[in-house]
């Protein structure tokens, strides 16, 4: 029996998809976790699982395992994408003893897992998302609307509003990396930086590149 099994891949939770290598699978005797950054962070106990089955949509790039579960707060469609043979992955999960673990005793750790499950899979506070989306759209519209109100629009509607929006995303991603206080404002209670680490690094890179490009275009 293996103590634990880990694998990097992709994940689909509902209609949201995290491509390789933005998702991690972790399994031991007590828990199965899928960390797909902001797409979702899911944690299961053996009793939460109905079945784990092979999932094949596109050869090689569309193979994975489908996790059928009982958690009402989670989306019913949970797939972990992998380049490995899905049957091999399921076999490795079985070797951890997770699927055969029928221990019914409730521990302190079980209560923490239940609390996290009740929060749903999305790791970021919903009010934070709403505020960010509204502010982002207002900044973009501050460039787009005046641009198309011109008699003869020329060039691209990239101005100071879009630049501030991208800069805001870049600054937020940097603060996620370095500030625990900022993380506590953004993340749900009990969530950690590891839950969004890959997304944060990707956001730093993409928003940083775009901010430099937009700044040059506005000079």
For each feature predicted by the language model, list its residue ranges:
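Acidic, Ser/Thr- and proline-rich intrinsically disordered linker/docking segments
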Residues: 1-14, 51-130
């Amino acid at each position: 029996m293996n103590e634990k099994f880990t694998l990097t891949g992709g994940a689909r939770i509902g209609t949201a998809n995290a491509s390789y290598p933005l998702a991690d699978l972790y399994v031991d005797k007590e828990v199965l976790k899928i960390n797909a950054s902001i797409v979702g962070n899911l944690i299961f106990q053996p009793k939460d699982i109905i079945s784990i089955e092979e999932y094949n949509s596109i050869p090689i790039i569309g193979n994975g395992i489908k996790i059928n579960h009982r958690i009402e707060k989670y989306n019913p469609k949970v797939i972990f994408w992998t380049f490995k043979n899905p049957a091999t992955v399921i076999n490795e999960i079985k070797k951890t003893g997770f699927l055969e673990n029928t221990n019914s005793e409730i521990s302190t750790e079980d209560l923490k897992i239940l609390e996290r499950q009740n929060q749903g899979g999305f790791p970021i506070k919903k009010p934070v998302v709403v505020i960010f989306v509204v502010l982002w759209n207002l900044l973009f519209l501050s460039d787009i609307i005046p641009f198309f109100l011109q008699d003869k629009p020329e060039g691209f509607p990239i101005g100071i509003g879009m630049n501030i929006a991208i800069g805001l995303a870049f600054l937020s991603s940097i603060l996620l990396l370095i500030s625990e206080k900022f993380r506590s404002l953004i993340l749900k209670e009990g969530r950690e930086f590891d839950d969004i680490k890959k997304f944060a690094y990707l956001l730093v890179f993409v928003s940083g590149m775009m901010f430099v490009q937009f700044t040059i275009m506005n000079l």
